[in-house]
């Protein structure tokens, strides 16, 4: 085979070889996708054109933000930030980090810092009519794609306006080619066409979230101040321009006035920015110890670590390095794939190649078998898949993704050595190996540039399923498989600006039950295949059954020839998709469970509300319902319960405790070829949202009742002019209890009816209302406690934290004037200065 890499004279020439090489194996869909524009008809044969779909399912969306009420606490934060006093900083963090204290054995108070100043009217309107991403569904719905909204948009190129047009799909220098999460879920790395690598950090603590909000607020203040300075300078020269700038400044300040993201995932600026690569970064991989490998078109692989500002090592290759992957159990070794046809096993400590294998084709993708990394799988430019033993890189088997005859040859035959016919395309652009949860078989996800995703059983050398719907175009799309409550979900990017998702039918138990009806066709082929299939055919059959030559004689007379025995694969077009970008989407990733666990430690709004308003009866109700479109199906999707027989869920039928991963919900990351990174999240289930809304409505009625009552004016005015500085007074914090299956809150909202005396239970402890238009903090900090004779609304002194009215003096205080009191319900100290 001629080495195509030797003929290239420039980077653009090789890029054109990758993007313009056609598939000659008879794939009509690929040629259509290359010829038609994004404004033409979609390959799925829908009646609407893609341009009409793009208008109906618009990608012109903004991250969900809420208007922030600038309270005294906000002013104090800015004052503390300006003073820089250590005591003030301590007090500021203390206010943010007081997670709660115990009221009694059944009640708990929590402070949610993101709620401290969210405008209740805007939040209430959102809860009534949330605006989610509009989905295009084909027959079935994926639970992981329900209630998606744009949570965050990361600007990799700060200070530059990202523009895109649907008429041109040419990638810019800002195009992002690779996106990978670290194994601990705390970081995400992106590699760009301009050779830059960015490390993004997941918000992992309340301190980080508090600093994030303060930083965003300071930046908005700085931008507004800059505009005012420009306005003053220009007014000296041109009075008319001053009037125009005054109007522009007012509009800007009104638009940008303290808007905070509803549920961010990452810090807005990269933790690290590496610029050592001089050409495109094509692939990125993380090790178990958070080391990073990057493969580039500058013919190098570089080793990084987020704790270091520069690369640790550089590994030189003779040609473009298209793919790289760490050994899953020993990160002293890694595999690289190069355009010189060679796959190399490198020793990082020795800084040398330990083994190499020449596959006689351009290597475009590589992966290792899960868990132990025993096998190395290579994908090539012309559509071949090579399976090697990782130790020594010795060949085991190979086949062509589009040629079933090569797939059914002897398992130990390398088709490139025995085939006189050289097949061209489709190009393999992505590989991912996984273990089936049905039979623990070794399976492979193959993405190719003929707009197909193929699922292979490598042990049986059998094509199981083909996923259709996305448009490959010229990008190196890599489908990602994620196991979500026992169900394999595949997501992929597309050149038509959309994101696609499928549920694997080949992994369904109902489809697996039909397999024995199709497997006799393979049994009639030969004794060797009979032994391969015997385990999945019948566990009770003995070895003597293999020697019966006429066992399936009648069936084989009705079947096609042996080389067509692989015809019965599943054609899966039941995808769900949404218009994610205004430019070709290059990467799509679902955040791993470790990311959700990290995010749950930062007082995430969705997680906190889902756990707080989750009721014990939810789990049993959900498990007893069928998978319909009712209210409980939303809880089913968010909290991980599945009513189908044989389904696997993180929450057992006897457990009433949701897992934090289920409470966080789906986190989906997508990138495009103009440098935009969008973070989509699943909102809280509808039943949780309705309970929160009921809580807000109940609170508003209570506020109106208070303002109409003259007896409570003194207590209201006192709460408006005071600021809570809670002292837990030795009371233990009511954090989540780790039960092994999830995190349980100290109580559930079983009584949310307004008639209940304990229905207004507080969720916050640290903010006070300042106007009749309340902030979110006042909802969860000024709710009343149990209605007893000593807690009537007409008492002049009430606790700023729990709104209780029972106080006792500290023992040992003799002076009546200097005596300090504390709230019996929550332990908050009340002294003369308050």
UniProtKB/Swiss-Prot annotation:
Keyword Cytoplasm: no
UniProt signal peptide: none
Domain of life of the source: Eukaryota
Biased composition (Basic and acidic residues): 1-16, 213-224
One BP term from GO: sterol transport
Pfam family, one: WD40
Modified residues annotated as Phosphothreonine in this record: 771
Region described as Disordered: spans on this chain: 1-51, 213-233, 761-789
Keywords: Phosphoprotein, Repeat, WD repeat
Modified residues (Phosphoserine): 528
Keyword Repeat applies: yes
Bias (Low complexity): 17-26
WD repeats: 171-210, 276-314, 316-356, 358-398, 423-468
More info: Present with 538 molecules/cell in log phase SD medium.
Family: Belongs to the WD repeat DGR2 family.
Name of the featured protein: WD repeat-containing protein YMR102C
Species assigned in the record: Saccharomyces cerevisiae (strain ATCC 204508 / S288c)
Organismal lineage: Eukaryota, Fungi, Dikarya, Ascomycota, Saccharomycotina
């Amino acid at each position: 085979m001629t080495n195509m890499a030797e003929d290239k004279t420039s980077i653009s020439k090789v890029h054109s070889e990758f993007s313009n090489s056609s598939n000659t194996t008879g794939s009509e869909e690929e040629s259509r996708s290359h010829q038609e524009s994004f404004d033409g008809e979609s390959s799925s044969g829908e009646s609407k054109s893609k341009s009409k779909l793009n208008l109906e399912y618009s990608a012109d969306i903004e991250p969900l933000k809420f208007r922030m009420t600038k309270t005294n606490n906000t002013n104090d934060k800015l004052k503390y930030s300006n003073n820089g006093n250590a005591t003030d900083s301590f007090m500021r963090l203390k206010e943010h980090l007081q997670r709660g204290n115990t009221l009694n054995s059944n009640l708990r108070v929590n402070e949610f810092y993101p709620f401290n100043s969210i405008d209740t009217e805007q939040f209430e309107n959102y809860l009534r009519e949330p605006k989610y991403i509009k989905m295009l569904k084909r027959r079935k719905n994926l639970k992981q794609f329900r209630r998606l909204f744009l949570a965050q948009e990361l600007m990799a190129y700060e200070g530059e306006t990202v523009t895109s047009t649907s008429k041109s799909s040419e990638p810019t220098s800002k195009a992002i080619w690779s996106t990978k999460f670290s194994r601990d879920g705390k970081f995400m790395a992106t590699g760009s066409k301009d050779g830059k690598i960015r490390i993004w950090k997941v918000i992992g603590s309340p301190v980080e979230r508090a600093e994030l909000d303060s930083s965003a607020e300071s930046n908005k203040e700085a931008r507004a101040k800059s505009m005012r300075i420009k306005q003053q300078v220009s007014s000296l020269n041109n009075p008319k321009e001053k009037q125009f700038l005054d109007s522009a400044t007012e509009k800007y300040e009104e638009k940008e006035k303290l808007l905070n993201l509803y549920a961010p995932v990452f810090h807005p600026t990269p933790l690290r920015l590496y610029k050592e690569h001089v050409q495109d970064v094509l692939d990125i991989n993380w090790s178990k110890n958070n080391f990073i490998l990057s493969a580039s078109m500058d013919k190098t692989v570089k080793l990084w670590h987020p704790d270091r500002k520069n690369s640790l090592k550089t590994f030189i290759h003779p040609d473009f390095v298209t793919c790289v992957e760490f050994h899953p159990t020993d990160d002293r070794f890694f595999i690289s794939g190069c355009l010189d046809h060679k796959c190399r096993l490198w020793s990082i400590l020795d800084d040398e190649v330990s083994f190499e294998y020449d596959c006689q084709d351009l290597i475009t993708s590589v992966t290792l078998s899960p868990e132990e990394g025993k096998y190395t799988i290579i994908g090539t430019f012309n559509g071949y898949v090579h399976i090697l033993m990782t130790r020594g890189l010795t060949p085991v088997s190979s086949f062509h993704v589009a040629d079933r005859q090569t797939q059914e040859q002897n398992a130990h035959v390398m088709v490139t050595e025995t085939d006189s016919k050289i097949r061209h395309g489709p190009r393999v652009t992505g590989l991912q190996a996984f273990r089936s949860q049905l039979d623990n078989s070794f399976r492979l996800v193959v993405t190719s540039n003929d707009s197909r995703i193929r699922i292979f059983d490598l042990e049986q050398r059998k094509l199981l399923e083909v996923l259709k719907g996305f448009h490959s175009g010229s990008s190196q799309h890599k489908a990602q498989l994620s196991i979500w409550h026992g169900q394999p979900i595949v997501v992929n990017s597309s050149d038509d600006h959309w994101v696609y998702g499928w549920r694997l039918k080949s992994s369904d138990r109902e489809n697996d039950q039909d397999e024995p009806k199709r497997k006799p066709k393979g049994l009639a082929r030969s004794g060797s295949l009979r032994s391969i299939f015997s385990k999945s055919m019948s566990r009770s059959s003995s070895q003597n059954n293999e020697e019966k030559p006429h066992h399936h004689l009648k069936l084989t007379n009705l079947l096609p020839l042996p080389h067509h025995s692989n015809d019965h694969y599943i054609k899966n077009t039941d995808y769900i998709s949404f218009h994610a970008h205004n430019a070709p989407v290059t990467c799509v990733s679902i955040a791993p469970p470790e990311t959700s666990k990290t995010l749950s430690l930062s007082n995430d709004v969705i997680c906190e509300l889902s756990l707080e308003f989750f009721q014990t009866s939810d789990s049993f109700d959900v498990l007893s319902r069928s998978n319909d479109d009712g209210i409980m199906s939303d809880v089913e999707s968010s909290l991980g319960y599945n009513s189908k027989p044989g389904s696997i869920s993180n929450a057992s039928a006897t457990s009433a405790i949701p897992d934090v991963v289920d409470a966080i919900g789906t986190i989906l990351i997508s990138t495009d070829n103009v440098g935009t990174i969008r973070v989509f999240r699943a909102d809280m289930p509808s039943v949780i949202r309705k309970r929160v809304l009921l809580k807000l409505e109940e609170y508003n009625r209570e506020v109106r009742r208070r303002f109409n009552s003259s007896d409570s004016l003194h207590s209201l005015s006192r709460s408006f002019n005071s600021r809570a500085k809670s002292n837990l007074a030795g009371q233990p914090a009511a954090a989540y209890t780790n039960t092994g299956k999830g995190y349980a809150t100290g109580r559930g909202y079983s009584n949310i009816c307004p008639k209940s005396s304990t229905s207004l239970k507080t969720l916050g402890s640290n903010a006070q209302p300042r106007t009749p238009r309340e902030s979110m903090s006042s909802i969860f900090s000024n709710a009343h406690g149990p209605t007893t004779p000593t807690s009537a609304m007409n008492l002049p002194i009430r606790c700023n934290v729990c709104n209780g009215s029972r106080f006792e003096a500290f023992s040992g205080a003799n002076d009546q004037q200097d005596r300090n009191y504390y709230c019996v319900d929550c332990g908050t100290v009340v002294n003369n200065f308050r």
